[in-house]
A protein has these predicted regions:
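Alpha-helical membrane insertion/targeting regions
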Residues: 2-188
Length: 188
């Protein structure tokens, strides 16, 4: 099994290369360095975002995971910007999705710092950011993934939001109700 197989040359960059069986945009060392950082930051964002979403809100673990998620999504956007700039014609849409994910995360992060617990802006911002990040991943990688390769391309664009939107809405509604109960002194 070859770990690296080059594709065609275009300008100074080798295009459509395969590394460990997965297609990458280039084998140029700078591209690969940014891609490596991008992948590690993306994995960190996926894990820490899931942790923050699943643990008790306001707990030390939620806060720590959320901060790591925000740092990771910031790095994902920064590296996506560089990677898209290197292959703008092919990857401009990934920059746009990355900008949306980073903007939503920033809105969610700032909203939580400026508003009281139970305010839904934080939940919606962070949840939308996570869904956008997964959309970018599946749009770019879905056609090369087992089982996902059988889905129509529109599914890569719509599934993360179709799954995420009801989860985000439920979490926001629950947070609103919990805040209302705590303000009135009712726990039931």
């Amino acid at each position: 099994m070859h770990c690296l197989a080059a594709g065609s040359v275009q300008g100074d960059m080798v295009m459509a290369a395969r590394i460990f069986g997965d297609q990458v945009g280039s084998t140029a060392p700078v591209f690969l360095a940014f891609l490596a950082v991008h992948v590690l930051a993306g994995l960190t964002a996926v894990v820490t975002g899931a942790i923050a979403a699943l643990v008790r809100k306001g707990s030390p673990l939620h806060i720590r995971a959320g901060r790591w998620y925000y740092r990771a999504i910031t790095l994902v956007f920064a590296t996506a910007t560089v990677l898209a700039a290197m292959r703008w014609r092919q990857d401009y849409y990934l920059f746009i999705i990355g900008a949306l994910a980073f903007t939503a995360a920033t809105v969610g992060y700032l909203h939580r710092r400026r508003h009281s617990p139970g305010d839904t802006g934080h939940i919606v911002g962070m949840g939308a950011s996570y869904a956008a990040m997964l959309t970018a991943f599946y749009v770019d990688n879905g056609p090369h993934l087992p089982l996902w390769d059988r889905l129509p391309p529109i599914a890569f664009w719509l599934l993360p939001s179709a799954i995420g939107a009801p989860i985000i809405a439920r979490a926001a509604i629950r947070a609103k109700h919990a805040t209302a109960r705590s303000r009135t002194g009712h726990d039931a």
